Amino acid sequence: MAVGRSGARRLRYGAVRDYLLESWHADHEGKLVKSGGPTIKNVSGYDLCRLLVGSLGTLGFLAEVTIRSLPVPPCSRWMTGVCDPFELQSRLYRPSCILWNGNEVWVLLEGHPADVEREANLTGLTDCSGPPVLPSVGRLSLRPKLLRELPKMYKQGWLAEIGVGLVHLPEPIKYDQSSLSAMTVMSDIKARLDPTGRLNPGREVF
C-alpha cells in the first residue's frame, strides 16, 4: 500500500488504492489516526487513507488496513508474440494485462476456462510461463493513447502497460515543468501532514 504498486493486473482490476476501505496510520507525532470506513457507504469527508497509498511513508506510516477483495479467477493464461498491442486490446473483452516493449507483446487472460480459451483463439499468440521482469529504475505515466510514440521516445529496455499508461524504464526519468507543478502541490500536502519533517526524512513526496 505504501509503495502504491498495483501489479500487472491493473488494466482489468484497477489501482490498489481503489480497494482500500479503511486504514490506521501513525502521524508525525506518533498518534494513531483512523480514516475511511469498513464499507464504502460508511466513508464521509476527505478520503485520507487513499492519499497515503503510494506516499512511501512521507505522509504517515500505515499500521493497519481494511481492503476489498475479489475471488481468484479459475483460469489464468499468459501468452506472447509479435502484434499491434492496441489492435489486440480492441479485440479482447477484458484482458487482465497487456505489456509491450515496442516489439513483443505479453497478454494475461483470466476468467472461466471456456471464456479464456475463446479469447486466446482471438489473439494469435503462443502460451508462455509469464511476463518479463519489469524494469524498476524509472516509472513514467502517460495518456494511454500516447504509448504509440514510445519507440520514438526511448531506446530498448522499456516496458509499457497498454490501456493503463504506465511505462517502466531502465533509467531514471527527468521531471518536466508539469511534474514540478505537481511537486509543489505535494510539498504543500507534506508540510500540512508532517510539519516536523519526521516522516521518512530525505524521501521526496513525488
Where are these regions (language model features)?
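FAD-binding subdomain of flavoenzyme oxidoreductases
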Residues: M1-S96, E104-W106
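Conserved glycine-rich FAD pyrophosphate-binding loop
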Residues: K31, G102, L122-F206
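Hydrophobic positions within alpha-helical membrane elements
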Residues: L62, S69, D115-E117, L199
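Histidine- and/or cysteine-centered catalytic micro-motif in compact active-site loops
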Residues: T66, W100-N103, E110-H112, R143-K145
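Generic "edge-of-domain/loop-turn" microfeature
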Residues: L70-P74, A114, L147
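Short amphipathic alpha-helix segments
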Residues: W78-I98, E117-A120, R139-G157
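Terminal amphipathic helices with adjacent charged low-complexity linkers/tails
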Residues: L108-C128
